[in-house]
């Protein structure tokens, strides 16, 4: 069985968020770098830097923690992997779901690279739905 790097990223971010860790380290691939750029641009993470250790590259992510009035620190409410290696989910640009009425984001893998649902609708292209963030 192969590794699902996208699921690994999502799980690492979710676990670090629940444990209130400030930084996490994930393996650096082209897909992970593109997803992290989207998360940085959308404001879910604070900082990203590339780190090399024994000829292997890692991305070190600094999570953005916002304090809720009730007490706990939360960055990302929910992350969910949609398309997976055993069941690929595709959508055209007209049927891309809106998460929380547009408050959440959908990350898609398209023929023009990895992008958010808003960018895909503007360009009029669909693709594989990788994950939801809300």
Curated annotation (Swiss-Prot):
Any GO CC annotation of this UniProt entry: ribonucleoprotein complex
Pfam families on file: Ribosomal_S8
Keywords: Chloroplast, Plastid, Ribonucleoprotein, Ribosomal protein, RNA-binding, rRNA-binding
Subcellular locations according to the entry: Plastid, Chloroplast
GO BP annotations listed: translation
Location (main, coarse): plastid
Any one GO molecular function term: rRNA binding
InterPro entries: Ribosomal_uS8, Ribosomal_uS8_CS, Ribosomal_uS8_sf
Subunit structure, interactors included: Part of the 30S ribosomal subunit.
Family as reported in the entry's similarity comment: Belongs to the universal ribosomal protein uS8 family.
Cross-referenced PANTHER family: 40S RIBOSOMAL PROTEIN S15A
Function recorded in the entry: One of the primary rRNA binding proteins, it binds directly to 16S rRNA central domain where it helps coordinate assembly of the platform of the 30S subunit.
Protein name, per record: Small ribosomal subunit protein uS8c
Phylogenetic placement of the source organism: Eukaryota, Viridiplantae, Streptophyta, Embryophyta, Tracheophyta
């Amino acid at each position: 069985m192969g590794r699902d790097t996208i699921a690994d990223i999502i799980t690492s971010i979710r676990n670090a968020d629940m444990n209130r860790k400030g930084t996490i380290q994930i393996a650096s691939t082209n897909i992970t770098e593109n997803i992290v750029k989207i998360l940085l641009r959308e404001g879910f993470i604070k900082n990203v830097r590339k780190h090399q250790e024994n000829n292997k590259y890692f991305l070190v992510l600094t999570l953005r923690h916002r304090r809720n009035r009730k007490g706990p620190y939360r960055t990302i409410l929910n992350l969910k992997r949609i398309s997976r290696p055993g069941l690929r989910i595709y959508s055209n640009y007209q049927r891309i779901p809106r998460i929380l009425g547009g408050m959440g984001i959908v990350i898609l893998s398209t023929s023009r690279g990895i992008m958010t649902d808003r960018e895909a609708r503007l360009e009029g292209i669909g693709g594989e739905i990788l994950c939801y963030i809300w």
